[in-house]
């Protein structure tokens, strides 16, 4: 179902024209009494809402929310924050800062040099 650019352009132009016509009708009929367009829009919104309510995924979400026992329980677990300072996972024998970890190699290069 591939559409060419010309087909898409024509579709966009027709949608733009329809949208402009709807805007003009709404501006003319903004006196406060409901029009056929507003009634049709309300029906469409209600139908979409009903379909969402009947969806299995909505029922599953509602069940999961009902199973939630207290405010501390989370449905989706949060990622634990890692500390900003991570120890090296490979041997860096006394290289760098002491806080970053070291295996204690006595022949390692140390900075700043010690006498």
UniProtKB/Swiss-Prot annotation:
InterPro entries: Caulimo_virion-assoc
GO molecular-function terms, A-Z: DNA binding
Pfam families on file: Cauli_DNA-bind
A GO cellular component annotation in the UniProt record: virion component
Main location (coarse class): virion
Sorted UniProt keywords: Coiled coil, Disulfide bond, Host cell junction, Virion
Subcellular location: Virion; Host cell junction, Host plasmodesma
Domain of life, per lineage: Viruses
Bias kind Polar residues: ranges: 96-106
Coiled-coil blocks: 1-28, 33-54
Region span, Disordered: 96-115
Subunit annotation: Homotetramer, through coiled-coil domain. Homotrimer when interacts with icosehadral capsid. Interacts with capsid protein, and with Movement protein.
Described function: Plays a role in virus cell-to-cell and plant-to-plant transmission. Interacts with virion icosahedral capsid and movement protein, thereby facilitating virion cell-to-cell transmission through plasmodesmata opened by viral movement protein. Also interacts with aphid transmission factor, attaching the virion to aphid stylet when the animal feeds on an virus infected plant. Aphid saliva may later detach the virion, inducing release of infectious particles when the animal feeds on a new plant.
Family: Belongs to the caulimovirus ORF III family.
Protein name (record): Virion-associated protein
